[in-house]
From Swiss-Prot:
UniProt-recorded Gene Ontology molecular function terms: beta-carotene 15,15'-dioxygenase activity; carotenoid dioxygenase activity; metal ion binding; monooxygenase activity
Cofactor(s) essential for the protein: Fe(2+)
Species the sequence originates in: Gallus gallus
Name used for this protein in its record: Beta,beta-carotene 15,15'-dioxygenase
CC per GO annotation: cytosol
Annotated transmembrane regions: none
Phylogenetic lineage: Eukaryota, Metazoa, Chordata, Craniata, Vertebrata
Biological process, per Gene Ontology: beta-carotene metabolic process; carotene catabolic process; response to retinoic acid; retinal metabolic process; retinoid metabolic process; retinol metabolic process
Family in the record: Belongs to the carotenoid oxygenase family.
Enzyme class: oxidoreductase
InterPro entries in the cross-refs: Carotenoid_Oase
Binding-site residues for Fe cation, renumbered to this chain: 172, 236, 307, 512
Involved pathway(s): Cofactor metabolism; retinol metabolism
A Pfam family of this chain: RPE65
Length: 526
């Protein structure tokens, strides 16, 4: 356990040929590119939290039935400063560093609240984002790092705040049919307001401006005022349908005064997050055409969520599925001091992740009686009209114990059937992966003893006619000593194993990633 979470992982920048068992589809050509923390000790200093570790990119390249593995640390400014100093000198969300000789690169850790908040790290360890023909490693700060998806080399650094007034941004953007990116970020006390900003990054630029970055053409779609000036909601993702943006303002809040003074108080930024269980969770819907928010107030009970699954419209309703918790215990479980050999026995979630479906009637009879359920679809989810005109929503439970959900992205924002996810139950350690049919609630599983699979990624087969026609890819770390990790390839329809590619390296647990088809990569490589 300590080996998997705490020990620094060696990078393998040159391709290593994997041992392939089984039969891989001939059409599966391209790169599975993933991101996650790989280094938690630098010199004599250690990070406090697993999510603080230095970003380690790794990839599996599929080429004519063969599979090649490589990994490389993201050469961020954070990485370079820390390695040069041989200690942690740049603060992360769960680890405050003192003193910081990189002040010429990173803004002061505190300043007058009306002018700025701490500038964060560029240790982009959470996900991968595609912008036009380029790929970026991302986290939840205002920095992203361009990377080469084939060699894993680190390239340009991009600061969102140069193009849009945000201090934080999600690592789960959405892509429209033209390849444009839609993302959200939080603007903290900008001109006396704290707001959630929805912005669009075009997939291409006009021919006469080819030398300019797509980010120079970034467009603010709209903004949603925070219900609290100094305590905005934390959010990890958001939803999208054909006509609406779905944003959930949850009572898991970031205290800006505490954030601005964390350095001088000797505490980490994570301590500035708190769950307000007595508060409501508010649902916001923004019309993508008019860029205006729906005026009706929709809410539910207090919850914490990280991942939206999918959303769609049906007969005047917006239906959205999320993985939700009753509290914020998940983050606290990943402090490294808790990840010892007895972790699985002693470190339990106090709230199991639950797949919830909310059904929100955007079109309803305004003369409906107070107390009546406005939902007209066949579901146990309800939306009850209150005296003040607001609508109180209760979900349908689709299943319990799943996280890191993915769908066939061709069905993103549309009515769909299938979710692919890890199974976590009362511990955040994934022991299986699952395929959930959200219409029948039937679940298929894959699992083996001592195996910890990563977020499963669906790859559609060419000319697929059905939603689950393709394969599911997951990186599997083995907790049993002397057993090598592997990439698992499942038939998405049957959830049966097609093959696996085993690599004799110490692979790290990762977070998120994407599959890049060969046609999107340009020149072939291993």
């Amino acid at each position: 356990m300590e080996t998997i979470f705490n020990r620094n992982k060696e990078e393998h920048p040159e391709p290593i040929k994997a041992e392939v068992q089984g039969q891989l589809p001939t059409w599966l050509q391209g790169v599975l590119l993933r991101n996650g923390p790989g280094m938690h000790t630098i010199g004599d200093t250690k990070y406090n939290h697993w999510f603080d570790g230095l970003a380690l990119l790794h990839s599996f390249t599929f080429k004519n039935g063969e599979v090649y593995y490589r990994s490389k640390y993201l050469r961020s400014d954070t990485y370079n400063c820390n390695i040069e100093a041989n200690r942690i000198v740049v603060s992360e969300f769960g680890t405050m560093a003192y003193p910081d000789p990189c002040k010429n690169i990173f803004a002061k850790a505190f300043s007058y609240l009306s002018h700025t908040i701490p500038e964060f790290t560029d240790n982009c360890l959470i996900n991968i984002m595609k912008t036009g023909d380029d790929y970026y490693a991302t986290s939840e700060t205002n920095f992203i790092r361009k990377i080469d998806p084939q060699t894993l080399e680190t390239l340009d650094k991009v600061d969102y705040s140069k193009y849009v007034a945000v201090n934080l941004a999600t690592s789960h953007p959405h892509y429209d049919s033209a390849g444009n990116i839609l993302n959200m970020g939080t603007s903290i006390v900008d001109k006396g307001r704290t707001k959630y900003v929805l912005f669009k990054i075009p997939s291409s630029v006009p021919e006469k401006e080819k030398k300019k970055s797509c980010f120079k053409h970034l467009e603010v779609v709209c903004s949603i005022p925070s219900r609290s000036l100094l305590q905005p909601s934390y959010y990890h993702s958001f939803g999208i349908t054909e006509n609406y943006i779905v944003f959930i303002e949850q009572p898991f809040k970031l205290d800006i005064v505490k954030l601005a003074t964390a350095y001088i108080r000797g505490v980490n930024w994570a301590s500035c997050l708190s769950f307000h269980k007595e508060d409501k969770t508010w649902f916001h819907f923004v019309d993508r055409k008019t860029k205006k928010e729906v005026s009706t107030k929709f809410y539910t009970d207090a919850l914490v969520l990280y991942h939206h699954i999918n959303a769609y419209e049906e007969d005047g309703h917006v239906v959205f599925d999320i993985v939700a918790y009753r509290d914020n215990s998940l983050y606290d479980m990943f402090y490294l001091k808790k990840l010892d050999k007895d972790f699985e026995v002693n470190n339990k979630l106090t709230s199991i992740p639950t797949c919830k479906r909310f059904v929100v009637p955007l079109q309803y009879d305004k003369d409906a009686e107070v107390g009546s359920n406005l939902v007209k679809l066949p579901t146990s989810a309800t939306a009850v009209k209150e005296k003040d005109g607001s609508i109180y929503c209760q979900p349908e439970i689709l299943c319990e114990g799943i996280e890191l959900p993915r769908v066939n992205y061709d069905y993103n924002g549309k009515k769909y059937k299938y979710v692919y996810a890890t199974e976590v139950q009362w511990s955040p350690v994934p022991t299986k992966i699952a395929k959930l049919n959200v219409q029948t609630k039937e679940v298929l599983h894959w699992g083996e003893d001592h195996c910890w699979p990563s977020e499963p990624i669906f790859v559609p087969s060419p000319d697929a006619r059905e939603e689950d026609e393709g394969v599911v890819l997951t990186c599997v770390v083995v907790s049993e000593p002397n057993k090598a990790p592997f990439l698992l390839i499942l038939d998405a329809k049957t959830f049966k194993e097609l093959g696996r590619a085993t690599v004799n390296v110490e692979m790290h647990l990762d977070l998120h990633g994407m599959f890049i088809p060969q046609n999107d990569l340009g020149a072939e490589t291993e």
